Amino acid sequence: YTQNSDRQVQSIAYSTDNGRSFTKYENNPVLTSDARDFRDPKVFWHKETQRWIMLLAVGQEMQIFSSSNLKDWAFESSFGEGQGAHGGVWECPDLFELPVDGTNEKKWVLLCNLNPGGPFGGSATQYFVGTFNGKEFVNESPSKTKWMDWGKDHYATVTWSDAPDNRRIAIAWMSNWQYANDVPTSQYRSPNQAAQYGDN
């Protein structure tokens, strides 16, 4: 998790009771930087290299780190220069593999949330499709900016796996930093539940 004190650093909290409670690791932080924006870790196990991968948002790029034990991290590469939209800070990264419909092929998808700089102003989620070898993500179409949703109410998208039918499930804010603090609710912000149907 990102520990926010005088600067943003990455720390560990672990559970020994199936997630009912968490203990902060005594040797936190496990990863530091001099960068002003250094946050939103996405950590996953990369089977091919037998290492943990951490993707972090750092200014207007994503940085990739690897570890064998979740405590000692090595910088592998950065992604972002000359890629996608750069109208604001890059946040909430995600990186995962998906099957390509109608083929036996799989491709990697990197999500990048941007604020401001969306196609209609304010916040938005862009994505990149390509390859990942455990160290470096390579975008297959670097001259294109791809948006996950063209509406104004889609930001901070994150995904998780391990659904019973092997789906990758995504969830996002149904809001925008242009007006997130001005919605007419007090116990929650924007809708509690929304669904999108159809093939689009």
Language model feature labels by segment:
Residues Y1-D40, W45-E91, P99-W150, D165, ...:
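Beta-rich carbohydrate-recognition and catalytic domains
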Residues E91-P93, Y155-T157:
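Repeated scaffold domains used in trafficking and secretory/extracellular systems
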